[in-house]
Amino acid sequence: MSVGNSCIKAFDFARCHVMVERGLSREECEGYVMKEIDFYMVDAFSTETFGGNAAAVCPLIEWLPDETLLKMSQQHNQSETAFFVTTDSGFELRWFTTQGEINLCGHATLAAAHVIFEYLDYPDTTIRFETRFVGPLAVTRSGDWLTLDFPGWDSEPVLPPPLLLEGLGISDYQQVRVARDYMVVLESQQQVEALRPDIHAMIPLGKMVCVTAPGEGEYDFVSRFFCPGEAVAEDPVTGSAHSMLIPYWADKLNKTQMLARQVSARSGDLRCQLVVDRVRIGGQATTYLIGKVLLR
């Protein structure tokens, strides 16, 4: 324990002792004692600082009230914060944005697994997470790579809403599909990279927007992911979007193992595999910050 933490604990103990002497119950006193929570900020899907997609990660002893988790996420001011608690079978995992809890987040799952493997003396090569909305998830480590095992999502072709094309600023496209999000397929990587969308104009769509195209060089496909109505206009690297992208490109390219790149400003590489109705999404991660959250 550091000197600073020792001083904090000593101060809280002394303050609690005084309150008890003044007639407060031990339970009332505990409400004034500071809680210490480990805090990590991790760049997921990258080996370089400021690359990939940043996520905050907080291991918890037990679940805090949802209101507290949301306020913590707002204070962290990252696109997502991953919270987890240890269970008999593994870990229970939840994700919060600055606006509320979400059903799935790939890069924050990768970041949480990175923290468990690197800092919590986890002995196995596979982590099993229980989640509230998408069931069990697994993350496996092999060397420096972490592989997410996520559900695959089939998408259906649709006629594009005019607001979608107008917001993206395009008239030519190969196909528009929909699953959890809209998926717009373009002809080339250059077209995806050149997009300058009007994010605000797409808010009435009520969905996130993924744009994809065949990749160049070693990459089988590329993508970008836009978030109308969210705090972050463009998500730098979106693991969960590949639950939709991998089944599509596996069918299109007639291959089950692929290398993908999300061509945002921060960018990131993803190893992709389709296994029946599941997808495996591989990435690397690097720690940017380690600290303490102090709650009263």
Residue map of PLM features:
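Active-site proximal loop and beta-alpha junction motif in alpha/beta enzyme cores
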Residues: 34-105, 110-296
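Short, low-complexity, intrinsically disordered N-terminal peptides in bacterial proteins
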Residues: 26-36
